[in-house]
Amino acid sequence: MDMESILLDAEERMEKAIAALEREFSRLRTGRASASLVDGIKVDYYGTPTPISQVASVAVPDSRCITIQPWDRNAFSLIEKAILKSDLGLNPVNDGKIIRINIPPLTEERRKDLGKMARKYAEEAKVAVRNVRRDANEQLKKLEKNKELSEDDLRKAQEDVQKLTDRFVAKTDEKAGAKEKEIMDI
């Protein structure tokens, strides 16, 4: 591997850490209903953990309600159990044709908890970015040790890796701040 491909690989892996953070954030409940809220919930469907979206239609008729319409009658109770078991604090209402989830307004305490979770996810993303930096720097040092890279080039490449890291850590902070603001807005 040469210096360029190490830097490109590091950038790609840092992008993936940010994408994972965005997925985690999409599952965090704000005050509004969103289909992505139930995306992470798996239903034990015939012994296989299956995403709700693969066993039912998920719709958001208004900002305070999610409706789930299972394609299989047997899935009603399974979906209901899966939603209750999730840590989202949602209460499904099953009327036999459709499952409704009314999204109650968040309490101040719940908002603070969600803010903490958002910060935790952001911190995990930063750790992932820093781990990528460490791996890239180790690969660069191996190149230098094998005389494939001069000391000056090593220093320059490490500076580039640090700039990448700083950029992605700043991006993480920016996304975390936006998510916290969204959670705290009533």
Swiss-Prot record:
An example of a Gene Ontology cellular component annotation for this protein is: cytosol
Pfam families, A to Z: RRF
Task: Enumerate the GO terms in the molecular function aspect.
Answer: ribosomal large subunit binding
What name has this protein been given in UniProt?
A: Ribosome-recycling factor
* Parts forming coiled coils: none
Task: Tell me where the signal peptide lies.
Answer: none
Concerning InterPro entries, the annotation shows: Ribosome_recyc_fac, Ribosome_recyc_fac_dom, RRF_sf
Role, per record: Responsible for the release of ribosomes from messenger RNA at the termination of protein biosynthesis. May increase the efficiency of translation by recycling ribosomes from one round of translation to another.
Keywords attached to this Swiss-Prot or TrEMBL record, sorted alphabetically, are:
Cytoplasm, Protein biosynthesis
State the organism named in the record. Nitratidesulfovibrio vulgaris (strain DP4)
Q: Which GO terms describe its biological process?
A: cytoplasmic translational termination
* NCBIfam families according to UniProt: frr
CDD domains per record: RRF (cd00520)
Entry keyword annotation includes Acyltransferase: no
Q: Which family does it belong to?
A: Belongs to the RRF family.
